[in-house]
Regions:
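Acidic-basic catalytic patches of nuclease active cores, encompassing PD-(D/E)XK
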Residues: 1-24
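Short amphipathic alpha-helical segments and helix-helix/interface helices
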Residues: 7-11, 60-65
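Beta-rich catalytic cores
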Residues: 29
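Conserved catalytic cores of phosphodiester-cleaving nucleases, focusing on short active-site segments
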Residues: 33-35, 40-50
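Nucleic-acid nuclease catalytic cores
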Residues: 65-91
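Charged phosphate-binding loop/patch that engages nucleotide di/tri-phosphates or the phosphate backbone
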Residues: 96-117
């Protein structure tokens, strides 16, 4: 799975959310997707991996640590998907996709969680 495919699937799976894809030239470490949900903005970093390890840049780590609320990581691994809060950054770095604290680990639960924000 590639990041662009994960983004397309994310948009298709969450039709009630307005997504704004951010290109890399905006700012180093700024998240890939700005979400507009129930009149509020949130950010989401999209990551894909074929292995357990997740590649997260130092700038993305810094952003996650500075924004512990309202920032998420959507991780695609082969045919699986998980959503994590940014405050889980340490676990993601240590445990990768197998981190034990996702908010949701399938599209239905991701959609249900985000729609309630």
């Amino acid at each position: 799975m590639k990041e662009k495919d994960l983004y397309k699937r994310f948009v298709n799976e969450t039709p009630k959310i307005l997504h704004h894809r951010i290109e890399n030239f905006i700012g180093v470490g700024f998240p890939d997707d700005v979400l507009y949900i129930n009149n509020k903005f949130y950010t989401c970093e999209l990551k894909c991996t074929d292995h357990n390890k997740i590649k997260i840049s130092p700038f993305q780590i810094s952003f996650a640590m500075q924004h512990p609320i309202g920032h998420y990581f959507l991780i695609g691994h082969k045919k699986e998907v998980k959503l994590f809060e940014s405050k889980s950054i340490d676990d993601l770095l240590k445990e990768g996709f197998k981190a034990k604290n996702p908010i949701a680990n399938n599209w239905k639960d991701i959609r249900d969680y985000l729609y309630k924000l």
